[in-house]
Amino acid sequence: MAIPFNPPPESLPSQSSLEELLDFDWDTVESIADDEGWTWDDNRGAYFEGGNIVSPDRILSVTRTRMDGYQSQIRSVSNDLTSGNISVSEWERRVAEITVSVALIFFLLGMGSRSKITGDDTEDVKDRLRLQFDYLRNFSEEILNGDLTVGRLSSRAELYIFDAQNNYSLGQEATHSASEYPFYSNVLGSTMPCEQCPRETAKGIVPRGELISIGQRICLSRCYCSFWYYRTQNESQVQTLPLIGIKDGWIGVRVPLRAM
């Protein structure tokens, strides 16, 4: 039986102390697109590199590499806590800092460019982060109460960066207005998806609002799927996934990116 982790007792600082992490400037947020040499084309609603569209597979590959690094950071912070090198208060602050960083980086990636981010977009991002701060404070209190094992603590901490990464999808939704891009399709982001994600992909190009939101499926915040947006429903789907039912499971055949 796993033994609960019991840190030394302490009083947590006011949760409002995390509010200063939301005093950010988009001009200083790291741009994955700039790092990769991608340029956003507003007319096409997509990134381009060397004259070619940046495929969902390429974006996914870069995303996974980045997320591996952020997971390592979270694991290191949690290991510092369970090894007695930092307090719960210090752990909470560092997890919050990483979460904010990931959220901003991926929202910017989803938007395409800093110039497109409005004040309302910024407030939406801040509100989502404040909600994560609420969850994080409850998490910290559970740790201090000795309610969690080391393994459970570490795996649960990683969920914060996966939730933050979902800001990419939120940025994509914001930058593709429903009036200009009234249709979308699901792009599968995993070779071992939950049962819902392939089904959403197989629905094809559908009106906005007809697919289950990313982060609300069985795989929850660990979903790597994304949406691809279209001006008309008769465009070539960026990724198709024919499905053949086998008992309660599904087999999918993935088709490469098509020319747009």
In which residue ranges do the predicted regions lie?
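Domain-core detector
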Residues: 2-222, 228-260
